[in-house]
Amino acid sequence: MAANGEEQQTQAGRHQEVGHKSLLQSDALYQYILETSVYPREPECMKELRELTAKHPWNIMTTSADEGQFLNMLLKLINAKNTMEIGVFTGYSLLATALAIPEDGKILAMDINRENYELGLPVIQKAGLEHKIEFKEGPALPVLDQMIEDGKYHGTYDFIFVDADKDNYINYHKRLIELVKVGGLIGYDNTLWNGSVVAPADAPMRKYVRYYRDFVLELNKALAADPRIEICMLPVGDGITLCRRIK
């Protein structure tokens, strides 16, 4: 009985406030990962941008350092060259991508806020990577619709990373599945949404976490049922679901 009581207390503690960036239940363990294998191997330009972004009032929006490392290696493993990113913020994941793709690789990057992108742009420029990036300011859906209408972009993307408005993830997926190549990957970020996907309905949550929670749950259910893709959900960062197009 004592063990069960301790377990219940632990579970209650985890749900005191849903909204922690790391999904690991031990902050010490997460810090160990960062200090042992992430920070020592982090490129200097990514470290600079990470530290710059940490001063931003909305720094929680950035891709975590361990996820940036994961994306960088993943892109190298699949030999990605033509990529897309929806939701850029200050550009940490964008920089991880630019470092991974070849010299003639391209990233179509879209965000509604150019100011945040330009905060990190000097770091990207100093690293000599700006030529790989085409940045478009504004909502991504009209751009995607135009690309699909043009017809020449179907199945042309090796990798697409989405870290934007969660209430549009389903709408993005409907379009991106046409633009990614067969065998290519789409990565949806925040699919475990601060752990809120398994939190009790009455658990205290930050307002933005509670607002987007149902949209994330809807996406996860839709991806699991989509016969056009293979999926893998990973507890990296705030949860990332990789979708490999198979048809």
Swiss-Prot record:
Keywords: Lignin biosynthesis, Metal-binding, Methyltransferase, S-adenosyl-L-methionine, Transferase. InterPro entries: Cation-dep_OMT (IPR050362), SAM-dependent_MTases_sf (IPR029063), SAM_O-MeTrfase (IPR002935). It is an enzyme of class 2 (transferase). Substrate binds at residues 21, 163, 194. A divalent metal cation binds at residues 163, 189-190. The keyword Lyase does not apply. PROSITE patterns: SAM_OMT_I. Signal peptide: none annotated. It catalyses: (E)-caffeoyl-CoA + S-adenosyl-L-methionine = (E)-feruloyl-CoA + S-adenosyl-L-homocysteine + H(+). The keyword Transferase applies. GO terms for molecular function: caffeoyl-CoA O-methyltransferase activity; metal ion binding. Its cofactor is a divalent metal cation. Pathway: Aromatic compound metabolism; phenylpropanoid biosynthesis. One of its GO terms (biological process) is methylation. Binds 1 divalent metal cation per subunit. Gene3D superfamilies: Vaccinia Virus protein VP39. Its EC number is 2.1.1.104. S-adenosyl-L-methionine binds at residues 63, 85, 87-88, 93, 111, 140, 165. Pfam families: Methyltransf_3. Belongs to the class I-like SAM-binding methyltransferase superfamily. Cation-dependent O-methyltransferase family. CCoAMT subfamily. PANTHER family: CAFFEOYL-COA O-METHYLTRANSFERASE 2, O-METHYLTRANSFERASE-RELATED. Methylates caffeoyl-CoA to feruloyl-CoA and 5-hydroxyferuloyl-CoA to sinapoyl-CoA. Plays a role in the synthesis of feruloylated polysaccharides. Involved in the reinforcement of the plant cell wall. Also involved in the responding to wounding or pathogen challenge by the increased formation of cell wall-bound ferulic acid polymers. This is Caffeoyl-CoA O-methyltransferase 2. It comes from Populus trichocarpa (Western balsam poplar).
